[in-house]
């Protein structure tokens, strides 16, 4: 009987130790002291891999509209976000908001190449002031969506340039008063 109690106690101790050590894992970033821990923690993109039905749905999405809409929709084909002379507002960033997680969750090289076709012009558009994106866009809203995209890209790629663009942009926001309403 003592052996069973000892074994049970040992197993429980291992489980508890394993669970608490997980909270210190990079995939489970908690709030630093003295902040209260959140009940739910957002996991970094890619820390959970889709399988089964979910993977099938994502593969259908990759073979469908998300994986191909930028091949034929003029607003995306010629988007200023990817270096063209077309649409410069929010369509490109919203498209990327779906494409980036899809490409990296599926580990799909074709989609990752598409992501790079968009991300490289965005990263290289960052100015010394911190503003980035198409030159003809003067509205802050599309950059809010683009910041989310850059953060997703940073999480899956580790590309520090994406994080630097976001940091520079937030410095710009701190130093530049709001320009609402848009006068143009």
Per-region residue spans from a language model:
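Hydrophobic helical h-region of N-terminal Sec-dependent signal peptides
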Residues: 10-14
